[in-house]
Amino acid sequence: QLLRVYIDGIPLDLASQLLPGRTKLGLAGLAVHIHLHAKAQQQYSDKQVSQAQAVNLSKAGFRNMLDSLEKTIQPLKWEPQGTEWGNYYNITNYSDDALKTKGEIVGRFVEKAAPRTAWDLGANNGMFSRELSRRCVETTASDIDPAAVEQDYLAVKANNEQHLLPLVIDLTNPSPALGWAHHERESMLERGPVDLVMALALIHHLAISNNVPLTSVAQFFAFAGKWAIVEFVPKSDSQVKRLLATRKDIFNKYTEEGFEEAFSAYFTIEEKVSIPGSERTLYLFKRK
């Protein structure tokens, strides 16, 4: 969210305020590159400096500074705590066999659609995104949870994966066009459309948690991609029951029939498969 506001980078003084106090200790690393630099910037912000007083850093000096920055950044690690979906696949109601079968069905759908580009929305740690990327589909895997995206990113980095880009995106409040005249950074939708949109275990969160009508979800998917792989999770599923436990069930159209009706306005149902060992159904849609 900070990078939406500061598209050229987070200001030094703000970064200095946000970092833990322990990073101010020592004479190297973050203490120098962030805190001392921010202090010096603030000290000289209202002072005039002549050209003669300006310090010209040599090429070697720039290289040394970059080396120091790299050595400061490389050891930094983030251990996320208390995030919503970072541990999702350890607590989901899918059995190992059901997860495996689900992956096989998704893979078959991908091969049938034969996309070159794809968005996996609500991708979590990218488990099923790899059914796309391993088939050389240029895939953006997005999720609202930074911990899940971090897991995905670390796996991409460790395995040198070339076709998968993990991003933190809140689909109910996606990245808008930013910058001068809204042209410096394109919005999420302006970066599409793609050949295929995938939304697994996501529809119930959009429709129930965020009150987005199924017709609006279908319209968005049709705008974003030619094909769609969508998982429908019924009200009888434990995850939907959990969502409805704290709110009144006003979602009369959230049924399998209502879901198919909403999506049929924009797509044809190419294939529909129930996932064994679960109450969920996978759909392959093609835009009309």
Q: Locations of the language-model features?
A:
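Conserved SAM-binding motif I beta-strand of class I
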Residues: E138-D143
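S-adenosyl-L-methionine
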Residues: Y153-R191
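Conserved SAM-binding loop of SAM-dependent methyltransferases across substrates and taxa
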Residues: N125-V137
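Conserved class I S-adenosyl-L-methionine
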Residues: A114-N124
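N-terminal auxiliary segments of SAM/dcSAM-dependent transferases
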Residues: Q1-K77
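A short, conserved alpha-helix within the catalytic core of class I
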Residues: H205-F221
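A conserved beta-strand element that flanks and buttresses the S-adenosyl-L-methionine
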Residues: M198
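Conserved beta-strand signature within the Rossmann-like core of class I S-adenosyl-L-methionine
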Residues: F220-K235
